Amino acid sequence: LLAFQVQADPIQNTDEETKTEEQPGEEDQAVSVSFGDPEGTSLQEESLRDLVCYCRKRGCKRREHMNGTCRKGHLLYTLCCR
């Protein structure tokens, strides 16, 4: 069993993402996800660095998969990543 601790920080969308995807609203928040030590670990490969995740109230959208949960205050959200 391998467990990840997800540290979520708000990120800014690029112009390309903004044009092609729905803007995160009140119920969706973009977050950056980092795994392990900031200096780098065996878990922090290229594929993990490019992971984009959202905290969503109602579940994941197309091309996203559930990667766990995230918390804002006392509310619990679904962590959806692509």
UniProtKB/Swiss-Prot annotation:
PANTHER family: ALPHA-DEFENSIN 1 (PTHR11876), ALPHA-DEFENSIN 1-RELATED (PTHR11876:SF2). It is found in: Secreted. Keywords: Antibiotic, Antimicrobial, Defensin, Disulfide bond, Secreted, Signal. Its main location: secreted. SMART domains: Defensin_propep, DEFSN. Belongs to the alpha-defensin family. Probably contributes to the antimicrobial barrier function of the small bowel mucosa. Residues 1-8 form the signal peptide. PROSITE patterns: DEFENSIN. Residues 1-43 are annotated as: Disordered. Disulfide bonds join 53-81, 55-70, 60-80. One of its GO terms (cellular component) is extracellular space. It comes from Mus musculus (Mouse). Residues 9-47 form a propeptide. This is Alpha-defensin 17. One of its GO terms (biological process) is defense response to bacterium.
